[in-house]
Design a protein with these regions (language model features):
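Phosphate-end processing signature that detects enzymes handling 5′-triphosphorylated RNA
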Residues: 13-277
Length: 277
């Protein structure tokens, strides 16, 4: 993209985002998302203390599957890891393993100055695949126009990383816009890239770790602030997709760079060669 054109595009998007309000009925969400890394003991203690002002989601623990789209050179996640003022991600999400007729969600997640703006549309897995991979036309809405622009702007977007995890969610009793989620058993893979393939892959976190996210359109309750302070729990910029990408990148580097010393066998002779990459 020409630099000036990219700059103008970002200015336009930022202008649009500043004007938006929360419109849940249109599946557009605006909120701040703050992440914390806890151990299991801390998570259980917090859940117990939250009972006085939070209620558990009616679905209990859910399994979430997210298929992230990116360019062949991982432009979207690389850009996100640079911590720019504005960034975006495109993903396809299901609750549990999908089949072709399962309702899934195409999500475009944008972030500007720590505020998250998420758009999503529901369709079957088969429809979503034909829409995202083969650009089959769907009903035109403001959300689909933005997704279409993303598909056009970033050339050759395709499934890049599959993530799955178990999530337990809680809502504030007096404000359903305030949510807290706990994610465990986070798995990733960069093969079998489909929501229909099942839940498996490599673990991102130790079994004792829990990723907590606070999602709010306003302030964090004082009880929550006190708990975090007393337990010395601090916010983190942890990203599931970025963590998976770092592993992918490290492995690609190892494959392209031979070890510093290796041996070549020629009959009875062993020749040691020092190779530096």
């Amino acid at each position: 993209i020409i630099p000036n054109l990219q700059l103008n595009l970002e200015r336009y998007v930022i202008h649009r985002l500043r004007k938006e309000t929360l419109m849940a009925d249109q599946m557009i969400f605006k909120r701040c998302e703050i992440k914390y890394m806890l151990d299991i003991t801390q998570a259980e203690l917090l859940k117990n203390q939250m009972k006085q002002y939070m209620t558990a989601d009616e679905h209990g623990v859910s399994t979430i599957c997210s298929l992230y789209f990116d360019t062949p050179d991982y432009l979207l996640i690389q850009r996100s890891m640079e911590h720019p003022v504005y960034k975006e991600k495109l993903r396809l999400r299901s609750y549990g393993t999908a089949d072709k007729d399962t309702t899934v969600f195409v999500e475009l997640k944008k972030k500007y100055e720590s505020v998250v703006y998420k758009r999503r549309i529901a369709m079957t897995e088969d429809e979503a695949e034909r829409y995202l991979l083969f650009h089959e036309k769907v009903k035109v809405t403001q959300i689909t126009r933005e997704i279409d622009y993303c598909l056009k702007n970033y050339k050759k977007l395709a499934p890049a990383v599959m993530l799955s995890y178990e999530r337990e969610a809680f809502y504030a009793k007096d404000d359903h816009e305030f949510r807290i989620t706990f994610d465990q058993n986070i798995l990733w893979r960069n093969y079998d890239l489909s929501l229909c393939k099942g839940i498996y892959g490599e673990a991102i976190l130790d079994k004792n770790k829990v990723l907590m996210e606070v999602k709010t359109a306003g302030a964090i309750p004082l009880l929550m602030v006190h708990f975090l302070t007393e337990n010395q729990i601090y916010k983190t910029s942890f990203s599931k997709y970025a963590t998976a990408y770092r592993t992918i990148y490290a492995r690609e580097q190892r494959r392209s760079c031979p070890p510093e010393n290796f041996f070549v066998f020629t009959g009875d002779e062993v020749v040691q060669q020092a190779i530096k990459c």
